UniProtKB/Swiss-Prot annotation:
Cofactor descriptive note: Binds 1 zinc ion per subunit.
Protein's name in the database: Alanine--tRNA ligase
GO CC annotation, single: cytosol
Predominant subcellular localization, coarse grouping: cytoplasm
Assembly behavior: Homotetramer.
Gene that produces this protein: alaS
Species classification: Bacteria, Pseudomonadati, Pseudomonadota, Gammaproteobacteria, Enterobacterales
Domain notes: Consists of three domains; the N-terminal catalytic domain, the editing domain and the C-terminal C-Ala domain. The editing domain removes incorrectly charged amino acids, while the C-Ala domain, along with tRNA(Ala), serves as a bridge to cooperatively bring together the editing and aminoacylation centers thus stimulating deacylation of misacylated tRNAs.
Transmembrane segments: none
């Protein structure tokens, strides 16, 4: 009996654990140590700094099953996913790693034992082929003499990519740094499948499939190309879980393994599809894996960077669901089946299931509103296309108006053998960006052009007043030697107490003073390593080299400090109340308010807002010490310090702790103790985007001001109701009850008036061939009363055709009623349409009742006068 995918994963980890390897959990799909990577795409990513010698672990052997995504950037498999046997946006990479421990001999022997051992994978040895780098005689001899593979199944691969060491069998991290030869293991599916061994002209066939790549990091490549042996060679291996599962389960396509069969059946169930061989099922089964795990790792759909890649994958899946005939939102329903089939690897996803489902559902609902119209436009454009290429302008219009990522458009076109002019699409995108820049209305931002060679030393943690020297001056972005009174400028000092805007905290304000001059600072910004003071010289003259006294606005800084410290407390409180999925997505810390954007799928309940508020105020009352420590980044993370997603940190970081409640990396300015904050109040909670909520709050004096304002409003209301704040609830309830009674009485009077009006109108009906026709314009009648009157009149008149109209604030309201015995000759919908057209409107409804509106009240008398002739003709 073949192993399940989950059992294969566990067997791999168990095998290497038995060989002294530390089992290390999969890292996030969002790399936390490599800004050059969009997503984690290999098992070695989380160990990159270990291989580079920048990080040390307490183990020298490791094994992982690493979640990986390849979609976007250099590794973009998206367009092939679902159409080939082995392309995926998401896959798991099984790996074993040696950090200066074992090398080629053990790495090869471990691989062979796992693959062929009777207690492990038990693959037939004669089905396995290997490749080695052309000059790697050591690996060749291990395979031939120690493992015993015949020479004809060991293939040397040279530099087949056009340059020295550019080979399928030579791995390098970059132009310089660790590199080395690799050996790859292939499985022969048999001669019933087309394809040749690696290195042959038929190597792209599906017969011989690479299942394991073992990299031997033994050199350090120098800038001049020289290869220096590493003092401690290492090993990095990777085996695709889905590929080895296909081999062990005796299938040729990854989509036929148990994991994908289960997901494909789930997709068919939620979309209503019956043909399990449909490639759209494969696309969706793949895409739910990448989308669900990306959301679980903190990525949300957006129009930029990782969020845009996620959006593209979701929308591609939704479009394929549409092709399968899905009539309602379906994609989020696959998260549950995915969790089940992933086994132990899905535990983190299970913890965040509700959040992930909500994000996927919201994104699908948004796209569903425009998908049908966008596809109709694309069909229309393709139908009239003369050549075989869709122009970039149309592809851009689909993106801009209907939210179609260009690869989704390309997907549709591909099915019809049509290409997309992607260069034209990019040109249209750039033109839109240019127009947006020109239309921003802010003119040129000269300060953004400032380049400062010197550095400024920030001393504002300990000082609010400091003497410094002017090292540079800028006016309209250009360096100058001096400025005069009235000029706006940017002043750079050698040292300053002014905090430059960063980490969400606004820049300081204050004054720079000296011999005969005063410079008012309205903002402080960073320019590389320099700190610029933006403002206006109000008196005197200032030149480079002048000595200045820098004075920060102390009261303003104090308010900012309170708000910043409260932001940290609120972040920790949100994670306690809502869950650990809460992550900071943006913030503003000013002297007046703090604003905090965070990941959460639904509006906070009033009880949750109160709980967060109470929790923060409880920490304020504890008067916790607020302490800062400078330490290594890894030590800070080990201490549990929260790092902001996407933020780049130096090797040495500033860790801010508030007792046992909050620990974060932060370079901002803060209170000394939580008690300094005084009071914390949330003033609003709202949504800014799918899955992103925003809280605005105030502290200290600002919070007290909101308390006073609320108290004043309550007193004003109490005064109006002739009560006091103590019995205000009873007073309001009494007023509401009295209002309901009066509204009920008023409606009764209106009904009576309408009934009386109906009785008066019935006598005005005229007889047309045995059918009573009543046409009337009514004054002082609410439009919603017309329907009641028509029902009353139909009961009174028997066989009848009725048209009533009223004009309120210049707008015409019309209604037509026809008794059921007359609807075979006169249709209310047709009648009301004829009248509405004459008063500048339109309408419709059932044969016995129809309503309409119009804008031309002056034309109403003539329109009503035309009814009798129209009805008479119908009754002939």
């Amino acid at each position: 009996m073949s192993k399940s995918t989950a059992e294969i994963r566990q067997a791999f980890l168990d095998f290497f654990h038995s060989k002294g390897h530390q089992v290390v959990a999969s890292s996030s799909l969002v790399p936390n140590n490599d800004p050059t990577l969009l997503f984690t795409n290999a098992g070695m990513n989380q160990f990159k700094d270990v291989f580079l010698g920048l990080d040390k672990r307490n183990y020298s052997r490791a094994t992982t099953s690493q979640r990986c995504v390849r979609a976007g950037g250099k590794h973009n498999d998206l367009e092939n996913v679902g159409y080939t046997a082995r392309h995926h946006t998401f896959f798991e990479m099984l790996g074993n790693f040696s950090f200066g421990d074992y090398f080629k001999h053990d790495a090869i022997q471990f691989a062979w034992e796992l693959l062929t051992g009777e207690n492990w994978f038990a693959l037939p040895k004669e089905r396995l082929w290997v490749t080695v780098y052309e000059t790697d005689d050591e690996a060749y001899e291990i395979w031939e003499k120690e493992v015993g593979i015949p020479r004809e199944r060991i293939i040397r691969i040279g530099d087949n990519k056009g340059a020295p060491y550019a080979s399928d069998n030579f791995w390098q991290m970059g132009d310089t740094g660790p590199c080395g030869p690799c050996t790859e293991i292939f499985y022969d599916h048999g001669d019933h499948i087309w394809g040749g061994p690696p290195g042959s002209p038929e190597e792209d066939g599906d017969r011989y499939i690479e299942i394991w790549n073992i990299v031997f990091m033994q050199f350090n490549r120098q800038a001049d190309g020289a290869m220096e042996p590493l003092p401690k060679p290492s090993v990095d291996t990777g085996m695709g879980l889905e590929r080895i599962a296909a081999v062990l389960q005796h299938v040729n396509s990854n989509y036929d393994i148990d994991l994908f069969r289960t997901l494909i059946e789930a997709v068919a169930k939620v979309t209503g599809a019956t043909d399990l061989g449909n490639k759209s099922l494969r696309v969706i089964a793949d895409h739910i894996r990448s989308c669900a795990f990306l959301v679980a790792d903190g990525v949300l759909p957006s129009n930029e960077n990782r969020g845009y890649v996620l959006r593209r994958i979701i929308r591609r899946a939704v479009r394929h669901g549409n092709m399968l005939g899905a009539k309602e939102t379906f994609f989020y329903k696959l998260v549950g089946p995915l969790i089940e089939v992933m086994g132990s690897a899905g535990e983190e996803l299970k913890r965040q299931q509700a959040q992930v489902e909500q994000v996927l559902k919201t994104e699908e609902e948004q796209f569903a509103r425009t998908l049908e119209r966008g596809l109709a436009l694309l069909d229309e454009e393709l139908a009239k296309l003369q050549g075989d290429t869709l122009d970039g302008e149309t592809a851009f219009r689909l993106y801009d108006t209907y939210g179609f990522p260009v690869d989704l458009t390309a997907d549709v076109c591909r099915e019809r053998n049509i290409k997309v002019d992607e260069a034209g699409f990019e040109a249209a995108m750039e033109e839109q960006r240019r127009r947006a820049r020109e239309a921003s209305g802010f003119g040129a931002d000269y300060n953004a052009m400032i380049r400062v060679d010197s550095a400024s030393e920030f001393k504002g943690y300990d000082h609010l007043e400091l003497n410094g020297k002017v090292t540079a001056l800028f006016v309209d972005g250009k360096a100058v030697e001096a400025i005069n009174a009235g000029q706006e400028a940017v002043v750079v000092l050698d040292q300053t107490p002014f905090y430059a805007e960063s980490g969400g905290q606004v820049g300081d304000k204050g004054e720079l003073k000296g011999a005969g001059f005063t410079f008012s600072v309205d903002d402080t910004q960073k320019y590389g390593q320099a700190i610029g003071h933006l403002g206006k010289l109000s008196a005197g003259a200032l030149k480079v080299g002048d000595a200045v006294q820098a004075d920060v606005d102390e009261a303003r800084r104090a308010r900012i400090r309170l708000n910043h410290s409260a932001t940290h407390l609120m972040h920790a409180a949100l994670r306690q109340v809502l869950g650990t999925h809460v992550a900071q997505k943006g913030s503003l810390v000013s002297d007046k308010v703090l604003r905090f954007d965070f990941s959460h799928n639904e509006a906070m309940k009033p009880s949750e807002i109160r709980e967060v508020e109470d929790l923060v105020n409880a920490q304020i009352r504890r008067n916790l010490p607020i302490e800062t420590n400078i330490m290594d980044l890894d030590a800070a993370k080990a201490k549990g310090a929260m790092a902001l997603f996407g933020e780049k940190y130096d090797e040495r970081v500033r860790v801010l702790s508030m007792g046992d409640f909050s620990t974060e990396l932060c370079g901002g300015t803060h209170a000394s103790r939580t008690g300094d904050i005084g009071l914390f109040r949330i003033i609003s909670e709202s949504g800014t985007a799918a899955g992103i909520r925003r809280i605005e709050a105030v502290t200290g004096e600002g919070a007290m001001a909101t308390v006073h304002a609320q108290s004043d409003r309550l007193n004003d209301i109490a005064h109006l109701l002739k009560g006091d704040s103590q019995n205000l609830g009873d007073k309001v309830r009494a007023v509401l009850e009295r209002t309901r009674q009066l509204e009920k009485e008023l409606q009764q009077l209106k009904d009576q008036a309408a009934a009386q009006e109906s009785a008066n109108l019935s006598s005005k009906a005229v007889d047309l061939n045995g059918v009573k026709l009543l046409v009337s314009e009514l004054a002082g009648i609410e439009p919603k009363m017309l329907r009641t009157m028509v029902d009353d009149l139909k009961n009174q008149l028997g066989s009848t055709v009725i048209v009533l109209a009223t004009v309120v604030e210049g707008k015409v309201s019309l209604i037509a009623g026809v008794s059921k015995d007359v609807t075979d000759r006169v249709k209310a919908g047709e009648l009301i349409g004829m009248v509405a057209q004459q008063v500048g409107g339109k309408g419709g409804g059932r044969p016995d009742m129809a309503q309409a509106g119009g804008t031309d009240a002056a034309a109403l008398p003539a329109a009503l006068a035309s009814v009798q002739g129209w009805v008479s003709a119908k009754l002939q």
